[in-house]
Amino acid sequence: MASNNNICAYELIEAEAQSWDYILSYLRPSCIKCAIQLGIPDILHKNADPIMSLSDLIAALPNLNPSKTTFIPILMRVLVDFGLFNYHQQQGDGYSLTTVGRLLVENHHFGNRSFFLFAQHPVVLNTAASVGDWLKDDLRTAFETADGKSHWDYCGADPEFNGVFNDAMAGDSRLMSNLLISDCCAGVFEGLTSLVDIGGGTGAVAMAIAGAFPSLKCIVLDLPHVIADRKGSGNLEFVAGSMFDKIPHANAILLKWILHNWDDEDCVKLLKKCKESISSRENGGKVIIIDMIMEDNYNNKQLVQSQHLMDLIMRITYASKERTEKEWEKLFLEAGFSGYKIITSLGLRSLIEIYP
């Protein structure tokens, strides 16, 4: 029987199931954070056998209240549903890490654990919860609505939050640096003698590149509170300063996840600064950009959804955005670059080489 608004019973049941998925979705990151706090990914990773029984897992959990042990299989059940762990019933209720679960292992070279913990920081969650209020006020970002100042000013004023943010960027950089020096991006750094990593944070990417290419001088440029007392060695150097003021001269410049933090006007301004600081195209000059290229790739719905959510995050946090290829091309031309090449082998993000 159809209801008055022409929704059949089957459609209503399907809609209700979907709505409950949205309602309960707040528990997903909470359960994952709980697993990280308990050290479950690390315990499974360090276990001698790939499959660990439930009883052994419970015994290995530090500081677990004995009265709460019955909750662990409940927690593990939902984490299996999320795809973090495999469940092996025939091995005595055993568990093993999935590829996604391995990304939550502490200090894993391909991990994004620190980025997950940053996303669950109260300051970040407060921003997301303030979007409705922000849409009614005159402030530039929801971050300012929630926390009273811009993201960058907040980082400069709050050492704890700044540390969590830098850890997240460093974790992502470790993952990305492994891809950059792999076959995925073969040839990008070949022939270069000097490289400036703008906004390179703690230097994770530059260190990996410097290690893979000993004859390539790598300079990390970032703000003083980010560089702090970090010292370089060998072919790695740290320079404190603003990218909008002065960029050291080099063959090439690396912008990893930088431009999506800024609006079009500031991006063009920064790209012009980069163009002034690199060699000519004939001498190998280029700017290497690692950023997202928005696309409607309907063959990968999860990728598209992640890109849409990332675009939303950039808009409410920095008053910036993710960009389509046409939007990128417009920036490059306005900044005076002659051409570009895209390497689409970095999953959610792409590598773009632009030439003076």
UniProtKB/Swiss-Prot annotation:
Pathway(s) this gene product operates in, as recorded in its UniProt entry: Flavonoid metabolism
Methyltransferase among keywords: yes
GO molecular function: O-methyltransferase activity; protein dimerization activity; S-adenosylmethionine-dependent methyltransferase activity
InterPro entries xrefs: COMT-like (IPR016461), O_MeTrfase_dom (IPR001077), Plant_O-MeTrfase_dimerisation (IPR012967), SAM-dependent_MTases_sf (IPR029063), WH-like_DNA-bd_sf (IPR036388), WH_DNA-bd_sf (IPR036390)
Catalytic center residues: 260
SUPFAM superfamilies per the UniProt record, alphabetical: S-adenosyl-L-methionine-dependent methyltransferases (SSF53335), Winged helix' DNA-binding domain (SSF46785)
UniProt KW 4Fe-4S keyword: no
EC number(s) stated in the UniProt entry for this protein: 2.1.1.-, 2.1.1.82, 2.1.1.155
GO biological process: biosynthetic process; flavonoid biosynthetic process; methylation
Gene3D superfamilies: Vaccinia Virus protein VP39, Winged helix-like DNA-binding domain superfamily/Winged helix DNA-binding domain
Annotated residues for binding of S-adenosyl-L-methionine: 222
Signal peptide per UniProt: none
The entry's keywords: Methyltransferase, S-adenosyl-L-methionine, Transferase
Catalytic activity, reaction form: quercetin + S-adenosyl-L-methionine = rhamnetin + S-adenosyl-L-homocysteine + H(+); kaempferol + S-adenosyl-L-methionine = kaempferide + S-adenosyl-L-homocysteine + H(+); myricetin + S-adenosyl-L-methionine = 7-O-methylmyricetin + S-adenosyl-L-homocysteine + H(+); kaempferide + S-adenosyl-L-methionine = 7,4'-O-dimethylkaempferol + S-adenosyl-L-homocysteine + H(+)
Domain of life: Eukaryota
Entry-linked PROSITE patterns: SAM_OMT_II (PS51683)
Subunit structure: Homodimer.
General function of this protein: Flavonoid 7/4'-O-methyltransferase involved in the biosynthesis of polymethoxylated flavonoids natural products such as myricetin derivatives, aroma compounds possessing antioxidant properties and exhibiting pharmacological activities such as anti-carcinogen, anti-viral, anti-thrombotic, anti-diabetic, anti-atherosclerotic, and anti-inflammatory effects. Catalyzes S-adenosylmethionine-dependent regioselective 7/4'-O-methylation of flavonoids; active on various hydroxylated flavonoid substrates.
Entry similarity comment: Belongs to the class I-like SAM-binding methyltransferase superfamily. Cation-independent O-methyltransferase family.
Full protein name: Myricetin 7/4'-O-methyltransferase 2
Native organism: Solanum lycopersicum (Tomato)
